[in-house]
Curated annotation (Swiss-Prot):
Catalyzes the reversible oxidation of malate to oxaloacetate. GO terms for biological process: malate metabolic process; tricarboxylic acid cycle. Substrate binds at residues 95, 101, 134, 165. This is Malate dehydrogenase. Keywords: NAD, Oxidoreductase, Tricarboxylic acid cycle. It comes from the Bacteria. It catalyses: (S)-malate + NAD(+) = oxaloacetate + NADH + H(+). The active site is at residue 190. The gene is mdh. PANTHER family: MALATE DEHYDROGENASE. The keyword NAD applies. One of its GO terms (molecular function) is L-malate dehydrogenase (NAD+) activity.
Length: 328
């Protein structure tokens, strides 16, 4: 029996990441090759953006995707999020030249408060929300706090790009296929302070830490490379990573919806105090997914260096949270 279509809302739909994302969702890469989708696309109510969105929709139509059951264009989150089952919040205010961090937080607080309220009012009660737009953890926290009638666990932030970047660096270092790496974790904020942790990782049952056996490489090469990869891409391409971010969003949502078969992945999720992180902090954790639910991998030993890294990324997140609390 064929499945009923699910509703997938995407914000910033005519942007670079949106363009790299929508065709893959419509082809079934995110929710499976048997799951029809209706795309509910949100762009800002500015003529240029709405015109660009029309062009993207024409292209989606021209692909004749068998799974694409409908496309809608919206300029208001209250209509874009109506009955949505999945919401990918990609659109955010980028940091402009000379813009202070406080201004960036305030501009995004406005966007994500409105979107959280709209989700609260009109989305499916089981909606799965992924915030991609930066600062992703804090934007997800703002949306969650603005949607008191939805379960906090429905709100997540994207750390999968950091996770995939870390896996790729480990594959290059060990000369092993990236798909063979298991039990990799990324802790904390989606920012250069994130802590990519391969202490538990294995390749073919063998410890990655033992294979690499180089703490200096970990500290001075691996962590800075993963942490500053976004900046390196901007320096090289002149624009921020879009295709790799879209790919990570697909990975995150696919695993959450369809499960990970016991494999660890990284998601930014609201803490309930795991590993001493204050409750409600939107924090990157290793998780497994099954039956549409994620579960934090608990009971992992945290050594002194790891604790130092976790404390640093937590301090940054707490600072961001303090920077927006008067706006909530």
């Amino acid at each position: 029996m064929s499945k009923s279509p699910v509703r997938v809302a995407v914000t910033g739909a005519a942007g670079q990441i949106g363009y790299a994302l929508l065709f893959r969702i419509a082809s079934g890469e995110m929710l499976g090759k048997d799951q029809p989708v209706i795309l509910q696309l949100l762009e800002v109510p500015v003529e240029k953006a709405q015109e660009a969105l029309k062009g993207v929709i024409m292209e989606l139509e021209d692909c004749a995707f068998p799974l694409l059951a409908g496309i809608e264009a919206h300029s208001d989150p209250m209509t874009a999020f109506k009955d949505t089952d999945y919401a990918l919040l990609v659109g955010a205010r980028p940091r402009g030249p000379g813009m202070e961090r406080a201004d960036l937080l305030a501009a995004n607080a406005q966007i994500f408060t409105a979107q959280g309220k709209a989700l609260n009012a009109v989305a499916s009660r089981n909606v799965k929300v992924l915030v991609v737009g930066n600062p992703a953890n804090t934007n997800a926290y703002i949306a969650m706090k603005s949607a008191p009638d939805l379960p906090a666990k429905n709100f997540t932030a994207m750390l999968r790009l950091d996770h995939n970047r870390a896996a790729s660096q480990i594959a290059a270092k060990t000369g092993k296929p990236v798909a063979s790496i298991e039990k990799l974790a990324v802790w904390g904020n989606h920012s250069p302070t994130m802590y990519a942790d391969y202490r538990f990782a294995t390749i073919g049952g063998e410890s990655v830490k033992d294979m690499i056996n180089d703490d200096v490489w970990n500290r001075d090469v691996f962590l800075p490379t993963v942490g500053k990869r976004g900046a390196a891409i901007i320096a090289a391409r002149g624009v921020s990573s879009a295709a790799s971010a879209a790919n990570a969003a697909i990975d995150h949502m696919r695993d959450w919806a369809l499960g990970t078969n016991g494999a660890w992945v990284t998601m930014g999720v609201p803490s309930k105090g795991e590993y001493g992180i204050p409750a409600e902090t939107m924090f990157g954790y290793p998780v497994t997914c099954e039956g549409g639910e994620y579960k934090i991998v608990e009971g992992l030993p945290i050594d002194a260096f790891s604790q130092e890294c976790i404390n640093k990324t937590l301090a940054e997140l707490e600072g961001e949270k303090d920077g927006v609390k008067h706006l909530l």
